[in-house]
């Protein structure tokens, strides 16, 4: 058994360093997270669908469970990639459905639409947003700690979890609901423009709201209300788009498929 003096010394060092042990544990978590992507039996599919359901109807409950996860596994981030994997699968199916609907039927065109939706809209933009959120929260929003307290920090993988959680309701609204409303949304009318733009403001406002809940669940962060500020900008843009008669669904379809509706 190690001497008491050594244990206390080591404990003090970790306390002064703040995140020494957590950083080491986090470095081990990243390879494990990606390794489990290729091991379906290790994924908790039932729990993932539970999260997806409550993200749409009671997202605050999801982050209460996140707090319990911290207590049991001593990390905020999920160690199970099932959520991201299932969401990528859903997005691939949805983007393929759009490609078929708009007669983008060649194999390369379908792959192009799927690639753009999954690897640009979700993954690349998500990595960027998660990194910005991770940097901003650790740099500006952490609560000052006392000299003998452990200095906690936001895990990058948790920031990416927040993006995944926030993106799922947006996916439901702007990929699924919008798809079934296309006959209405693509009509040349003011009602179609208002309905389309309303879907977009609801989807992106919900994204920022769930993002706020994710960071607000961390007890060592303060002023997390800043993640709600973009919603005000969205409402201003919404009013401008309605006044101008801009239909965002038409604009997005034109961008993705390269033709004018």
Curated annotation (Swiss-Prot):
Name the UniProt key words of this record, in alphabetical order.
Answer: Membrane, Transmembrane, Transmembrane helix
> Its membrane topology, per UniProt?
Multi-pass membrane protein
Q: Which Pfam families match?
A: UNC-50
- InterPro entries (alphabetical): UNC-50
Task: State where it is primarily located.
Answer: membrane
- Cellular component annotations (GO), alphabetically ordered: Golgi membrane
Q: Where in the cell is it found?
A: Membrane
**Endpoints of the signal sequence:** none
Record field: transmembrane:
37-57, 82-102, 113-133, 166-186, 190-210, 225-245
Could you say which protein family the record assigns here?
Answer: Belongs to the unc-50 family.
Protein name as it appears in the record: Protein unc-50 homolog
Organism annotation: Dictyostelium discoideum (Social amoeba)
């Amino acid at each position: 058994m190690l001497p008491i003096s050594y244990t206390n010394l080591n404990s003090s060092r970790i306390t002064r360093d703040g995140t020494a042990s957590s950083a080491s544990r986090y470095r081990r978590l990243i390879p494990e997270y990606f390794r489990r992507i290729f091991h379906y039996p290790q994924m908790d599919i039932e729990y993932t669908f539970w999260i997806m359901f409550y993200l749409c109807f009671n997202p605050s409950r999801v982050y209460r469970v996140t707090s319990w996860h911290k207590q049991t596994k001593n990390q905020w981030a999920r160690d199970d990639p099932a959520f991201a994997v299932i969401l990528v699968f859903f997005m691939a199916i949805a983007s393929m459905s759009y490609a078929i609907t708009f007669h983008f039927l060649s194999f390369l065109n379908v792959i192009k639409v799927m690639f753009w939706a999954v690897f640009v809209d979700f993954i690349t933009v998500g990595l960027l947003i998660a990194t910005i959120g991770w940097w901003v929260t650790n740099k500006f929003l952490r609560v000052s700690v006392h000299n003998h307290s452990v200095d906690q920090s936001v895990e990058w993988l948790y920031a990416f979890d927040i993006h995944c959680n926030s993106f799922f309701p947006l996916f439901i609204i702007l990929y699924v609901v919008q798809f079934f409303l296309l006959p209405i949304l693509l009509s040349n009318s003011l009602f179609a423009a208002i309905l389309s733009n309303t879907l977009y403001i609801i989807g992106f406002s919900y994204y920022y709201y769930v993002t706020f809940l994710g960071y607000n669940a961390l007890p060592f962060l303060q002023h997390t209300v800043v993640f709600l500020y973009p919603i005000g900008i969205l409402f201003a843009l919404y009013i401008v788009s309605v006044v101008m008669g801009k239909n965002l669904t038409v604009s997005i379809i034109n961008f993705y498929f390269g033709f004018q509706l």
